[in-house]
């Protein structure tokens, strides 16, 4: 799927300014450039374009609130100076698996004053002598390179993940979840009540039918008893009648 079409689907009837996270992994970029993404995505904090065939990010729109950018598994070899201009608040940048060969290519990242984490796995630059020491020297604001700090201590999960929602947003999500859960619970209770009422009604109908059937049986028994009484009375009268004839 082409990138601009993917963005349209990801919007899900929202406006670009409502979107804080946008994942475009594995879609197709025509001519190796970002397409369909505009500066209308002014609230965007997380953008992922993994394996989309990018060769350049020169047309990246202005994204002032972007905190984390995933650009791994592409064919980017330069143009990184655009990041400081378009994404001044970027904290986490993943360039793993791109065509970055030397330190001069990443030197423009010095202007990203808030850059905290940088990943360059599977880039040729990692084969240089004293690669880690030189990157930390070139980019003193960076705390974690390829998931480890200057002392080779692994970054905490929160720093590796990079994108963490604010507490207020988490509270809002929890409130929405609680409201939804309560709504589902109320609906289940209503369904149970309706089922109980249906069972009561069906039980009353069964009792009525049983009562009706019992009534029919009682009527039949009464008729049989009446018939037996008539038969016995006839038998009693017959001998009397014979006696009268003899007289």
UniProtKB/Swiss-Prot annotation:
Indicate where the modification Phosphoserine is found in the sequence: 17, 158, 202
Disulfide bridges in this chain: none
Source taxon at top rank: Eukaryota
What ranges does the record give for the region Interaction with E4F1, renumbered to this chain? Answer: 165-247
Q: Where are the stretches annotated Necessary for tumor-suppressive function?
A: 150-172
Bias (Acidic residues) ranges: 157-230
Q: Where is this region: Disordered?
A: 150-247
- Family assignment from sequence similarity: Belongs to the ANP32 family.
Protein role:
Multifunctional protein that is involved in the regulation of many processes including tumor suppression, apoptosis, cell cycle progression or transcription. Promotes apoptosis by favouring the activation of caspase-9/CASP9 and allowing apoptosome formation. In addition, plays a role in the modulation of histone acetylation and transcription as part of the INHAT (inhibitor of histone acetyltransferases) complex. Inhibits the histone-acetyltranferase activity of EP300/CREBBP (CREB-binding protein) and EP300/CREBBP-associated factor by histone masking.
Name by which UniProt lists this protein:
Acidic leucine-rich nuclear phosphoprotein 32 family member A
Organism of this sequence: Mus musculus
Name the gene that codes for it: Anp32a
